[in-house]
Structures are given as structure tokens and as C-alpha cells.
């Protein structure tokens, strides 16, 4: 007969259920469970004396008849589409079901069959998110990949060839030779990868060559000359070959102003990097481009969020990254023109309004590759404290704000770069790139990272201990990151033209390669929970930013969550 237990006891046993609320780490963000797929009384849980045992919660069903490879039990899913409690079934490295796991012969409502061939991961009391996507990577050193993975990022898009001077400044992998070498290097790296070719050319031939060689996109960067002619040529090739174009515009306004760049774009889809401008772009008003319907605007994390240290650290970072000389007054003036407290403050608010849609790192080129998710939720916290609840949220929770911010580092970069059919959300059919977080460490330290259905990273104790938990406990790579397990668990994204040219075979690639698609039809309206189109203007004298006539300003944060409380530095 049924046995009633208290809500607290239930949460401690099976994790929170509908109506329960959770604080995200040490932030002011409160999450509330919207739905629970569990059938009360028929929950599954692994362990001695628990449910997933032969003839109880485990059926006799073999894998060949539909039992899943892995079940994540009682996880609290946080995604752009909802905050729900569910079991998640994985097969062949993909998500096959979100619902109720167990044995259909003994339990009600089973949609995920647990069999003798099923592994169990306990999701009770933990938050499950899609693996993060960082779409602004300078591939300066391979050690970035481990650092990103340790933060919950499982997909990295960008450009570079290592610590070359060009790569230190620009996210471009220029030319067929370098693209080929980077695609080969990707074979040993346990994340999904894609590389941008250099988009700075006024004629199409060299751009087409790079796309055919395997570039999944093209990057226009001012350090290579982002002129109206280059913008037009690059976008024309992108439209023809279905790849995304990313742009870092002309800070010095040498070849034109922001209005000239908008005119050169001609209404075509484009991903604007560090759209506020401290990372580069038309001074002082590149930020206004976020109001264009064809523009997919992103930030990089050096300015996320605006704090009392933001301005001070930027000048030195900028001088190093862009190969500037502090002894040359013009170089110093160039750097100083990009750093404006008014536009950085406005950037916080534009993110909170959903007018800026994506957050990425700018790894080792002013940004920190291991802090994308951390900085995203620090921004959300700061805005909750300074602006209060969003109109869409209730007095009980911050669900809409939390979903808006998780979308910035998951589904929206996936949509922008034509990879959303494989990654970016927890939905059936997608690659099982998943991150489990203890709520007290959400956004700062994942408990477990799953890549293509295999565990690639986890918090792990002393390997010589008698159990897995004795200290020192820290993140370490797991079996999924080694040997031939790596290739089938990871994707390399190429252009369709490169796939047609059989580039994977020509380069001897063993990883699964996928063509990006539908990059030219995506507009800002397609970006989840971040599609606002305010009319933005900047006062050229004071740099004050206005959206639909309203001044956007906020104070710098003095103290942040997800910081020194968690990091012994």
C-alpha cells in the first residue's frame, strides 16, 4: 500500500519535485521545478536495497529490444525549454528519451526501459544541463580544451593555429594547410570542434578554398582589415556555401562607421562578436547593431559582468592581445578608445533584456576559457540584485531569467552556427553531451561531464583510496576522453562543401564529421528567449547608451558569487 513521506524526505531521497525551489550556488537566483515526469511510488533509484534490481525496476529486456545503454535517474533538467524533473535515457551516444525509467512489467508509466545492459548515473538532487558551447575560441594552446571541459563546455568553435601572433589576436585558421592540421589535431581532443577560416578578402576565391578545405565558418577581424568590400565578399561566399560569418568590426572607423558596416552587411545573417565593443568594434557605438533583426549579437566574458575591476584590467590585456606597443601613443589611444564604462554597463542590461543573445570566452585573447558559464550566471545574479525580478518571473522564482541565461551558452550558439540538430539542448535525438551539477556548485564546478554518452570528466578523489571520495577531490579526465573511445563520442563540424569533397577521408579523420547547415536562414527571432530588438543609440560625447529612449546604466559589482568562496587562489 502507498506510504506517505514528507516533501523534505522525498527531496532527500529522489531529488526535488514539482513546486520545490533551489538556490543556484551562492547566487540570488532561485529555480522552481515546473514539472515532474516521475510516477510517485514507482521512482527508480540504484543502490543496495533500492529499485533498479532484477525483476524490480530492472526488466529482462536486452539492448536489442530497446533497453537503454545508460539511465540518468531523477535529474533536474535545466534547459531553455523548461525546468523539469525526469529520468533521461541514452543509447548509441544520443538522448533517446526524457521521461520515466524502469521496468514496464512491474511499474506504471515507463517510457525508458532499464535492462541488464543498462548503466545507471544517479541524478538525484543534481541539476542536468546541456554541455556548454563556446563559439569564440582563439585556439592558442591545446590545454584550453581540458580547462573548458572542466567548466562544463563540450563544444568549442573558433580559429587559430597555436600561439602564432595572428591567433593571439584573431579567431581565424587561415588557409587550407592550417585548417587541415587543426582538423587532424582535433582527433585527440575530447570536445566537439569547428574551425573558422579567415574571411578578410575582397574577392571570393581564397574564401571558397578555405570553406572547401573544412572551415565551418568564416571570421572577419579588424586586425586583418574588415572593410565594406571584405564584409560583402565574405557574406556572399557564406550565402553560397551555407556557413556562418563572425565579425569583429573596425574600432578605428578607418574604412567606415557602424552605419557603413550595417550597409555592407545588406540584411544578411551575421554573428557579431563582443558586440559591446571593449573586445573590438566601431567606437563608440557598435553596440547599436544588436537592434538589427539579421544580427546575432554575442558578448565575450572579459566584460561579464561589469565590476569594479573590469576597466582596470582591460588596457593591459588589450595591448598584449592585439600586438600593440605601449610606447606608441597611437597604439595606446587605440586601446583606450575601446574601453568605455558606459557601454559595458549597458551590456549587462541588454543581456538581461534578451537583446544580447550569446556569451562566449575569447579564450586567452582577453577572455577566460574556463569561465563562460560562471560569468554568465554572475551576470544573471548581478541583474537580479540590481534590477529585480523580470516581468515574466513570479515572486517565487527566477525561472525565466535562468532559462534566458542558460540559452546564451547552449542553444543559441548552436542555432547561430548551424549545429543545433546535434547539440545545444537536452532533447531526444541530440548528442548526449550533458553536465551534472550539485546545486551548491552550479556554474562553477561540474560534478560529471558526459560526452556522446560516455563520462569524460568528473570530480574524483585519490585514485589509491579504498573508495572514490577521499581527498584531494578535483576534476580529472575519465575513460571517455582516452583512446579510441574519444572519436565516436565527439563531432567535428565542417562545411557541406568539405564533406562533399571528402575532406575527412583525405585527412585521415576518424571522428564523426557533420556538416553545418541552415546558417544563412537563422535570424535573431530564432534565438531562444534572447530575441529582443531594441532601438539602441549612443551619445557620441558621453557614451551613454539608450534603448528605445531609456538610459541603460548600472553600477559595477563590488562582490560577486561563484568567486573566491569556491576558488582557493
Swiss-Prot record:
UniProt PTM: Carboxylation allows a single lysine to coordinate two nickel ions.
Keyword field contains Hydrolase: yes
Urease domain: residues covered: 131-569
Binding of substrate, residues: 221
Domain of life: Bacteria
Keywords from the named record: Cytoplasm, Hydrolase, Metal-binding, Nickel
PROSITE patterns for the chain: UREASE_1 (PS01120), UREASE_2 (PS00145), UREASE_3 (PS51368)
Active site residues of this protein: 322 (proton donor)
Any GO BP annotation: urea catabolic process
Residues annotated to bind Ni(2+) 1: 136, 138, 219, 362
Modified residues (N6-carboxylysine): 219
Principal EC category: hydrolase
GO terms for MF: nickel cation binding; urease activity
Cofactor entry: Ni cation
Reaction(s) catalysed by this chain's protein: urea + 2 H2O + H(+) = hydrogencarbonate + 2 NH4(+)
EC code(s) of this entry: 3.5.1.5
Entry's Gene Ontology cellular component terms: cytoplasm
Cofactor note as given: Binds 2 nickel ions per subunit.
UniProt subcellular location: Cytoplasm
Binding site for Ni(2+) 2: 219, 248, 274
Pathways involved: Nitrogen metabolism; urea degradation; CO(2) and NH(3) from urea (urease route): step 1/1
Subunit structure: Heterotrimer of UreA (gamma), UreB (beta) and UreC (alpha) subunits. Three heterotrimers associate to form the active enzyme.
Stated family: Belongs to the metallo-dependent hydrolases superfamily. Urease alpha subunit family.
Full protein name: Urease subunit alpha
Species, as recorded: Synechococcus sp. (strain CC9902)
